Amino acid sequence: MLVLPSELNTELYPEVIEAITRSNPDETISQIKAAEDFCKSYLFKYDLIALFGNDKADPVVSPTVKDENLKKTIKVIASYWLVRKASPNVNLDLFREDFELMVGNKEIPGWLYDIKEGNISPDWPYKPDNPDTPEDESATNDGVHWSSNQKRTQRF
């Protein structure tokens, strides 16, 4: 995991997290993993192993790219989902504004949405080419991609 449960303390107080999850650490881990998967769905053209690592592999692969803004986005998303579950002494509107700033949508573009649309280009590695496929995926994920049909000769 890119974000540990103890790192959510920058977004929510520990006693608030314990009140929401009823002292169940599995609930916090579940929300963090869901937030990471949510971010991965936006960042499909980048090398997700370099950004997030792989905790399902043996041995575990650590992320090679360190980006604090990506970590902050995951923390905001996980915190927002925790607060939506139950919000003891937490202003939900403040978390909604943070969520819109970090994620966004078509009407209110946020950081992740702008990366997906190509408006922001972070200094992250693109997904490597898969040698088992005929197409070069690393070239298609670049900012500019073009192709054409084969030239054909017409005879009458």
Q: What kind of feature is each model-predicted range?
A:
Residues 12, 39-42, 77, 81-86:
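Generic structural signal for hydrophobic core residues of well-folded globular domains
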Residues 4, 24, 31, 35, ...:
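Alpha-helical structural motif
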Residues 80-156:
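Short loop/turn elements at secondary-structure junctions
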